[in-house]
């Protein structure tokens, strides 16, 4: 299981942008099997500009390596179809979660309104959250040829250092649950955390803070899936 810590605003912006892109109606409703290779020219280019240009600088390269580049051509069509099916399965199993397709991957957002949440200043997985993570682990078992990036966030209440540690512990708790309790391979998971530095809502309101206390999961095709898709496409 790989973990890394990066606090720069640039990387935080990358994940904020992922969520922002995913919440656009056009991105949410588009079928990636139909789009095929052209997805690389849209949001993939944005992610490449933010993350890819900083490979090797302050650890950002590892984050970029986890997300990877968009696979184009016929292989991209095949991968898009598989990831579409996985995203649909997750939506069916966990209707409360926010599930969006971004490039070749899937971004899931769990906050206090979607079943996976933490008590104030706590990072243990409660029984209600376990039930949701159990459903997601079943989907991850059904689709084994993916890697998973788990990202923790907090609201702005409390000291910056405390929130950074708290977001780290929460993200690692989710990863540990998948690996230690559900038996998923640790090699599939990378854990990251941003404390309060990447909010998606207004921290001055109770509703906004609840949305910012969240965990994101980015599910991306692994090299096995990519290589098989290239072989099937004759590329």
PLM region spans:
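Bacterial N-terminal signal peptides that target proteins for export
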Residues: 1-12
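C-terminal motif of bacterial Sec signal peptides marking the signal peptidase cleavage site
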Residues: 19-23
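Short, low-complexity, glycine-enriched hydrophobic/amphipathic alpha-helices that associate
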Residues: 26-88
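Extracytoplasmic/secreted proteins, especially bacterial periplasmic and envelope-associated proteins
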Residues: 37, 42-46, 50, 65-66, ...
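Amphipathic, membrane-active segments
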Residues: 83-114
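Short, solvent-exposed beta-strand/turn patches at coil↔beta or beta↔helix junctions
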Residues: 102-134, 154-161
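Periplasmic peptidoglycan-binding/anchoring modules of Gram-negative envelope and division proteins
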Residues: 118-151, 175, 210-212, 217, ...
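Periplasmic OmpA-like peptidoglycan-binding domain that tethers envelope proteins to the cell wall
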Residues: 153-228
């Amino acid at each position: 299981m790989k973990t890394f810590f990066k606090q720069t605003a640039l990387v935080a912006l990358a994940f904020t942008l992922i969520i922002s892109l995913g919440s656009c109606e056009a991105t949410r409703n588009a079928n990636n099997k139909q789009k095929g290779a052209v997805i690389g020219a849209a949001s993939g280019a944005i992610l490449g500009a933010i993350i890819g240009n900083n490979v090797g600088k302050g650890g950002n390269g590892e984050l970029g390596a986890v997300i990877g580049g968009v696979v184009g051509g016929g292989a991209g069509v095949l991968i898009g179809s598989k990831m579409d099916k996985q995203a649909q399965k997750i939506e069916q199993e966990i209707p409360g979660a926010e599930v969006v397709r971004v490039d070749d991957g899937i971004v899931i957002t769990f906050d206090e309104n979607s079943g996976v949440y933490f008590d104030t200043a706590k990072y243990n997985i409660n029984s209600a959250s376990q039930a949701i993570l159990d459903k997601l682990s079943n989907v991850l078992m059904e689709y084994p040829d993916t890697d998973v990036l788990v990202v923790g966030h907090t609201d702005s209440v409390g000291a910056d250092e405390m929130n950074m540690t708290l977001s780290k512990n929460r993200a690692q708790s989710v990863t540990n649950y998948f690996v230690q309790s559900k038996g998923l391979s640790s090699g599939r998971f990378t854990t990251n955390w941003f404390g309060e530095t990447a909010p998606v809502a207004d921290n001055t309101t109770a509703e906004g803070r609840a949305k910012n206390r969240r965990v994101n999961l980015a599910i991306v095709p692994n090299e096995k899936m990519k290589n098989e898709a290239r072989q099937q496409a004759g590329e």
